[in-house]
Every structure is written in C-alpha cells, then in structure tokens.
C-alpha cells in the first residue's frame, strides 16, 4: 500500500495512538514517582518587616474619668448639671409642678402633683413612674420627686385666703331679727321701696254674695299663691289622723298573732 493513498484522518488517529503508547510506557517506567523538593536557598529568603515598638496606653485607667464627670469641661461653673434631650433646661417643667395633696397611712403613701390647671397625676411611694415623675420620699407637708427637671423637693401648697371666688350666698339663709346684711364696698345704697298700698276691704254686693277674692300682688309684680282656708286645713288634718289610725291598726293586727304563740 502506498503512503500517498493514506488519508488525513488516518494520520491523525495514528499520531494520537502513538502518544498514548508513549505515555503508558513512561508511566510504567516510573515517571513522576521521584518528585522531591529543592533544597533551601538562603539567597531567596526575604527578611520579615520589623514591628514598631508598642505605643504607651492612651486611654489610661477608668478611674481618671471620674474627675471629668465631677468637673465637666463645658459647664460654666465646672459642676455637674442634669442633661436634657429636649434642648431646654427643665426650669419650665419644674416650675409648673406643684404638690397639691398628700395621703399618708401606715401601709400606703401617695402624693398628688398638679402639672397644669387641667392635668394632675398621683404617684405612689415605691411605685412606677407616672408621666415621668417618681415619688422618692413623702412627708406630711412635703414630697421629694424625680422627674424631667431632676430631683426636687416640693412643699404642700395650702390656700392662704387670698384670691379665688367668694362663696355663693344662699338666698333662703335665715338671718337674725333686726340684722342688716352688709353692703359690698363701693356700691350705692338701694333706693327706698315704697310701701305697698293697704288691701281693700271687699264690699258686700247686693244679693248676699261676696265678690271674688283677688290674690294680693307683691311689689315685684308677681302674684302670691292663695293660702288654704280653714276648712281645707281641717280636712288635711283629718286625713292624716285617719291614716295614722289605719297604720296603727295594721301594726297591732300584725303583732297579735306573734304574741299568742
């Protein structure tokens, strides 16, 4: 067979088979079994960088910061003051709180605080905070509280007799005979009221019939209610007496069976 007649595909397959046989022979001969590390070369070893010396401790012990807390740097008097997140100094909140009530017993202690004219809270000693206020100590006329304005001692406010509205005068209050009520200051006296005219005596009309009785009128123009006559008063008394006798008989009739047993 001539070489010119062999195709390209045949040459490609023959090349692959030849290389495969070569690799198999080398593997059987021990190819790759004697892989070893090269000896160390001192010239190739790089020098490690030197670490800098440790710096001294900058923060220092925690005890040093106690002086900063005792003498704050941003305070004008270098004294500690309460810190407010709202941005105010708390004087407005502290000035509006007033102690208006104290309740002291052997087992219960409570104080009433007035925050504004329309709002008040009740805080109990040893209890939870109410609207940011907590009761720390309570005395008969003072209380120590902790709130947005810090810790403060409030004195119990009592009425000193000044200000407020005067008591309402009662119209039907009896007065001593001959007593004259005092006039308010800077008020002119009321003009004298003319005496009412005497009541006219009803005249007997011809025929023996009395004229109709006209109820007397008061000075203010209102008519007075007619008074009951003697016959009406007598009839009312008789009804009351009859009712009393009836109740007495019923009471005696109900107690008689119990007495006979």
From Swiss-Prot:
GO terms for cellular component: plasma membrane. It is a single-pass type II membrane protein. The keyword Cell inner membrane applies. Residues 1-10 are cytoplasmic. Residues 158-261 are annotated as: Disordered. Residues 201-211 have a biased composition (Low complexity). InterPro entries: XpsN-like (IPR048187). It is found in: Cell inner membrane. Its main location: membrane. Residues 179-200 have a biased composition (Pro residues). Residues 227-244 have a biased composition (Basic and acidic residues). Involved in a general secretion pathway (GSP) for the export of proteins. Binds to XpsD. NCBIfam families: sec_prot_XpsN (NF041470). This is General secretion pathway protein N. The lineage of its organism: Bacteria, Pseudomonadati, Pseudomonadota, Gammaproteobacteria, Lysobacterales.
